[in-house]
Amino acid sequence: MKNTRRDFLRAAAAAGVCVVSCRFPAKVAGGLKELRFGMCADVHKDIMHDADERLGAYLECMTKKDAHFVVQMGDFCQPKKANDSFRAVWQSWEGDQYNVVGNHDMDGGFSREDFRQYLGMEKGYYTYLEQGYRFIVLDGNDRHENAPGGYPRHVGEKQRTWLTETLSSTIEPVVVLVHQSLQNASGVDNGAEVRAILEAANEAAGWGRVLACFSGHHHLDDLVEVNGIPYVQVNSMSYYWVGNSKKHESYPTEVHAEHPWIQYTSPYADPLWAFVTIDPKGELRIEGVRSRWVGPSPAELGYEEGKDEQGITPNVTARNVSLQMKERG
């Protein structure tokens, strides 16, 4: 059973809104314009039976909201021919679009280079300007020399040097995008080291230049402020993972027969995404989407591994955040 794009868009009308108050220093404010962009994370085409419809609903909503650009935050799809129709949905967007590399985008034996080539990415980490704001995309999939097994989750020395140089050679307000969180313990394993670079940029600028850092990966709806920088975890578009011990059927049997990985998830009835507006007069707004669980929730399944995690919910919710943007004297 598939929800239609119209069903998904109807659910999006119940979106929450987060308002961030800010004040830009005069030396940068003159070059800023209102910026509107859409952000989705962890669609997981290779798990979800209705990933194409979910992605299409997101893009249709962003078109109606007149977004300047859209971004997907990783764990998008494996770079293989079977996913070409899904890629075509993504590439149907007529404006600017940006990609972040997730760890599961290399499942099936694919490399980062394979994924980048599949989506037309020159590099896994890069920077771009939109309406006077500088976006910095990081690749959290480096592997350091003494890394344990499992998926790599590191920002290497070369990339950190590039980040430092990019921040020191520019003056614009900054938004950071990375798949794995820089503050979650199961995110980037040297997240504190990367955060220190961002904090140093704020100190050098004399104001809260790094407006926010957005990530996906954890399938959580959460926000934590660390040393004046908000770290926003954008929930998965599709589900929360509950694993083998809590596998169950949320959809009709025929759906699970064709898409067996869904049984390890608690799916969201509607696709989740965030719509962000940055107003040069001094306001950052995050609109989200509220949905519901398909079948039992993780709590109803007795899922214990996530009992201490914040943000296990089928929503991208409203939040109130205060940013100190005034230039220090």
What is the meaning of each model-derived region?
Residues 37-39, 70-72, 99, 176, ...:
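Residue-level marker for buried hydrophobic side chains located in beta-strands
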Residues 81-169, 193-210, 220-264, 268, ...:
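Extended active-site neighborhood of metal-dependent phosphoesterases/phosphodiesterases
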Residues 42, 74-75, 102-103, 179, ...:
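Active-site glycine-centered loops adjacent to acidic/histidine catalytic or metal-binding residues
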Residues 22-85:
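N-terminal active-site segment of His-dependent metallophosphoesterases
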